[in-house]
Amino acid sequence: MRVLERMYRSPLGRMMSIVAEALAKFQKPFMVYGYVDPISGRFRKYTRISSTATIMNEKRLSIGDYVWVWHYSILDATEGLVIEEGCQIGAWAGIFTHGSEHSIRLLGSDFVHVPNTLREGYTRGAVRLGAYTFVGAGSVILPGVTIGKGCLIGTGTLVAKDVPDFSVVVGCPGKIKGSTLDIDKKFFLESDFSRTYFEPQAVFEIKKRLTAP
């Protein structure tokens, strides 16, 4: 492990993360190691978030450890955003918990004078990403969506409704095209990942699929 990574994961990590976030304002895009979860106050030393990622209403963001958020992505936590352990979010992805797509027509020029909480037609809804879900670059997740654990959201996918665990979702609008358990089954044919697989209970299902006719 590189010296810098060891320092990030040491007791100095929290302070180094704060300094890195400050320097990010003046530097080219880079990954910031470590993040203090606003909800729990815990330091996620293995989480990495790009210096160019935008977090809206950060105090309503709950984020697990081992999370990766790449360059120029938007995390809108206005109505509550939960990103569970191990999720990865590609570049230029957008996760939104509120929107004004109807409200601007209904309120017209009055829109800017009405507080967010009172705007009629405003779209609101918390978003949750289940553990070890991958969100491809350029994908958009709309307000109110819950995505299960172990999912694969393809590049450029628009997710407008809930997604069950272990789903493969692609397209605009996004549609379920398969299961990551079937994808992972192919890897289990080459090597046994029982020890490291993120969800031990799913290993039984994968192995059952290996023996299915």
Place the predicted regions along the sequence by residue.
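Short, functionally important structural connectors and interaction interfaces within domains
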Residues: 35, 47, 53-55, 119, ...
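Outer-envelope exported proteins of Gram-negative bacteria
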Residues: 84-92, 150, 154-156, 166
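Terminal amphipathic alpha-helical/low-complexity segments used for targeting or macromolecular assembly
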Residues: 1-39, 45, 86, 99-105, ...
